[in-house]
């Protein structure tokens, strides 16, 4: 039956392209929406993920960066440094503000970095300096291109002028970017020299970040210590909570449209072969054989459509960033598993719907030319 289904499916190339193409486009819609949401989540936590820190220490009960404020006395850095298992501690200052160039205003995480820090700085420099000195700023390359900023130009950050000395990659999302200035400049503009926002902690070799975070939480008062993974997860959860309704509705609508198109494609493709099934019955095929043939054809169509739709989605993940868009698509394993499994179920159901008509076919209609 599988061989028969395969031959029947590939017998008419035009019909094959229509059925597989319809399924592929439907699945492309579903996979693309999932990839966009996964990509946005990845972009939002990129700074945390690439900070190089094993543990993030913040003010008590502050568990994320987005729309949050953390303030710690600088003495906390010395206390954390003496916790067993801590190899190094790097303080940073943080605020959400605009990078202003002419009439262009770009929302950004403004990060104040200590001199020669090994943690928390830009991880991918396309041109210029890798760390800002006093009076300097490193901004995202895409933001710079959109605003017409070149190396050596000045931008306004936190109400002061900074010379752009470096462009970073991977530090922009659909909603904001990350800009880096020196901690000294940050302190002077804020008018405070004895507080920090976050501590980025590197653990000693052989130490567990979870165990060291627990020690910091126990031994240092009024702080929250989280591993990098936990801190990133909290950041993603905040974004999800803020956009849950919109994203859920978009995903649901796209998913339902995609499944409806796929179900209709499989259904009409199955009915279009009624004459062929009638001929099989005339030649002595049992209804069970027809059922298996129909099901096999539907599943083959969906598998081919899924592979084609996945290829198109992966192509989009490469092409879209090339055109300078801050939109990043990322296909996740969970998305592939969800879409693939549901697609097979829908394919089976869609193929079963016309089976009653196929089972009731009169073999004589083949010879009557109907």
Feature locations, PLM:
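Hydrophobic secondary-structure segments that place a key small or acidic residue at a functional site
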Residues: 92-95, 103-114, 124-185, 192
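N-terminal Sec/SRP start-transfer signal
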Residues: 1-28, 41, 46, 295
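Mechanotransmission and gating elements of multispan inner-membrane complexes involved in transport
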Residues: 83, 156, 160-163, 167-249, ...
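C-terminal membrane-exit region of the final transmembrane helix in multipass inner-membrane proteins
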Residues: 331, 335-370
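Short helix-to-coil transition segments within interhelical loops
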Residues: 9, 279-288, 361, 370
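Transmembrane alpha-helical interface segments in multi-pass membrane proteins
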Residues: 254, 275-321, 338-346, 354
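Hydrophobic, regular-secondary-structure patches
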Residues: 28-108, 127, 214-218, 224
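Peri-transmembrane interface segments
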Residues: 36, 215-260, 269-274, 279-280, ...
């Amino acid at each position: 039956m599988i061989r028969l289904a395969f031959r029947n499916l590939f017998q008419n190339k035009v019909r094959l392209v229509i059925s597989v193409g319809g399924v592929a486009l439907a699945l492309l819609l579903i996979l693309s929406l999932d990839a966009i949401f996964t990509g946005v989540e990845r972009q939002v936590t990129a700074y945390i993920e690439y900070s190089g820190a094993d543990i993030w220490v913040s003010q008590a009960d502050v568990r994320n960066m987005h729309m949050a404020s953390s303030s710690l006395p600088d003495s906390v850095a010395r206390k954390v440094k003496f916790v067993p298992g801590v190899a190094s501690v790097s303080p940073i200052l943080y605020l959400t503000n605009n990078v202003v160039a002419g009439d262009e205003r770009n929302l950004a995480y403004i990060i104040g970095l200590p001199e020669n820090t090994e943690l928390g700085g830009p991880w991918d420099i396309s041109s210029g300096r890798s760390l800002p000195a006093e009076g300097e700023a490193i901004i995202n390359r895409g933001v710079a291109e959109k605003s017409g900023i070149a190396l050596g130009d000045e931008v306004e950050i936190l109400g002061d002028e900074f010379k752009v000395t470096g462009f970073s990659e991977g530090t922009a999302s659909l909603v904001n970017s990350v800009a880096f200035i020196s901690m000294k400049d940050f302190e002077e503009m804020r008018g405070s020299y004895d507080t920090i926002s976050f501590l980025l902690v590197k653990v000693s070799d052989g130490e567990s970040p979870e165990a060291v975070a627990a020690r910091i939480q126990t031994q240092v008062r009024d702080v929250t210590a989280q591993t990098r993974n936990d801190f990133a997860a909290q950041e993603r959860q905040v974004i999800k909570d803020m956009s849950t309704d919109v994203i859920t509705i978009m995903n649901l609508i796209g998913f339902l449209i995609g499944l409806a198109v796929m179900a209709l494609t499989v259904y009409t493709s199955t009915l279009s072969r009624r004459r062929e099934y009638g001929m099989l019955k005339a030649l002595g095929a049992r209804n069970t054989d027809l059922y298996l043939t129909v099901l096999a054809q539907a599943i083959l169509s969906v598998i081919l459509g899924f592979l084609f739709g996945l290829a198109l989605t992966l192509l989009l993940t490469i092409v879209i960033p090339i055109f300078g868009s801050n939109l990043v698509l990322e296909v996740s394993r969970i998305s592939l598993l969800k879409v693939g499994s549901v697609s097979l179920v829908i394919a089976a159901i869609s193929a079963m719907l016309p089976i009653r008509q196929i089972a009731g076919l009169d073999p004589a209609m083949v010879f009557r030319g109907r």
